[in-house]
């Protein structure tokens, strides 16, 4: 629904400035986290690769030190864009983690999250076609593609009008995503304890 509204809005813009993805947002690549393994008994973070973007954090998820740059630490609500391998986007909702290479954390100090999220999403299918054309290497896009990916920026009044519509709905979507993930984690913990016999069902009152 939000995507349709966004597409309809940009299709009907009358006055706008032509820009690019790289000018409306910062695309920060993750690190090769195998170089930042936690030391014994050191606090650590789960490492987010494309598998974790799609399937979530599991007991097989790698860990990294917390001693990494803030730019590659992700938190709930952050926009992620996998630009190599299986190109995809998501809004993160699984807690604090370390971002692995081949995934961008997308941020902006100038434009709202919904704006750069949907503009990046608009170009995703084209990015996938570019990546699919790289037959001799793992499919990916180059950073230069962000520089030539067209973005239409409306006059500020129009942007603010749309912001009043999009922001509450987008925030609700993110909050629901995070709540669903929290409930899923609680369910998995309880199921694990139940399977191990750590929960006595006879003592549970319904």
Show which residues each predicted segment covers.
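A short beta-sheet element
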Residues: 49, 69-125, 130-136, 142
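Residues marking the start of alpha-helices
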Residues: 137, 149-150
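Sequence-specific dsDNA recognition surfaces
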Residues: 22-37, 44-76, 98-99
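Non-catalytic DNA-recognition/assembly elements of restriction-modification systems
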Residues: 1-32, 53, 152, 156-201
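A short, polar/charged loop/turn motif at coil->beta-strand junctions and beta-hairpin connectors
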Residues: 15, 41-44
């Amino acid at each position: 629904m939000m995507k349709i509204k966004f597409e309809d809005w940009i299709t009907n813009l009358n006055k706008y400035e032509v820009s690019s993805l790289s000018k409306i947002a910062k695309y920060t690549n993750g690190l090769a986290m195998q170089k930042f393994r936690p030391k014994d008994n050191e606090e650590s973070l789960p490492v987010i690769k494309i598998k974790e973007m799609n399937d979530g954090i599991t007991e097989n998820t790698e860990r990294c030190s917390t001693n990494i740059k803030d730019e590659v630490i992700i938190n709930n609500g952050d926009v992620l864009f996998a630009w190599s391998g299986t190109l995809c986007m998501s809004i993160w909702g699984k807690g604090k983690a370390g971002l692995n290479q081949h995934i961008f954390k997308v941020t902006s100090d100038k434009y709202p999250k919904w704006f750069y999220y949907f503009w990046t999403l608009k170009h995703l299918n084209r990015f996938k076609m570019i990546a699919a054309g790289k037959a001799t290497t793992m499919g990916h896009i180059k950073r230069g593609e962000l520089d030539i990916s067209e973005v239409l920026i409306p006059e500020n009044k129009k942007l603010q009008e749309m912001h009043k519509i999009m922001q509450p709905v987008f925030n609700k979507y993110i909050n629901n995503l995070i709540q669903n993930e929290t409930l899923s984690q609680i369910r998995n913990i309880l199921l694990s304890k139940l399977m191990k016999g750590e929960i006595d069902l006879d003592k549970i009152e319904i």
